[in-house]
Amino acid sequence: GVHCNGWKKKSDEFYFFFAKRSKHLNDFPNLYDNLVGGGQPSGISIYENLKKEAFEEAGIFQLKKKYITKGNTINYFHNHKNFAFSGIIFVYDYEIYKDINFKNMDGEVESFYCISVDKLFTLLEKKKLKPNAIISIADFFLRNLSEYFPKKGILEIKNILKND
């Protein structure tokens, strides 16, 4: 599916925008997720799905192309409820260039948060992020903020995300 990091830079500090998932969802309730994300249906392009999900998840009526960056396409495997799953994430980044009041339209999101990089690490430590949301965030860091990781860590993450 598509996963879109919402981000902005203010006074040389990066901030990420997250959607807190509804407590009523069966999978990963109350966890923080990428600003926009959703499965890829057949019959529409990945970019059209990004626009659809941006509206449904965050009430973004029009994504401005000049603020969108295509990240990597990442294959991954995970275990959930004693089952193994595979997936593909089409990573996008959306620079939040002005103040936006995000509004969920499909009932899957409880609220939205803007979080500094330092607080992002706290969410990771406390396991408050939806597991596959971490993949697109790591991709963003590798492409834009690699100075936050030790060189050995960068090599390990790149090796994990490599699609061989």
Report the location of each language-model feature.
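Active-site segment of metal-dependent pyrophosphate-handling enzymes
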Residues: 7-11, 22-25, 59-101
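A short glycine-/small-residue-rich loop at the edge of a beta-strand within enzyme catalytic domains
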Residues: 37-45, 79, 83, 111
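Terminal peptide-recognition signature
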Residues: 4, 54, 92
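Conserved Nudix-box catalytic region and its N-terminal flanking loop in Nudix hydrolases
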Residues: 13-56, 60, 69-72, 160-164
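Generic beta-strand structural signal
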Residues: 1-5, 14-17
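Nudix hydrolase/Nudix homology domain
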Residues: 24, 30-32, 85, 89-91, ...
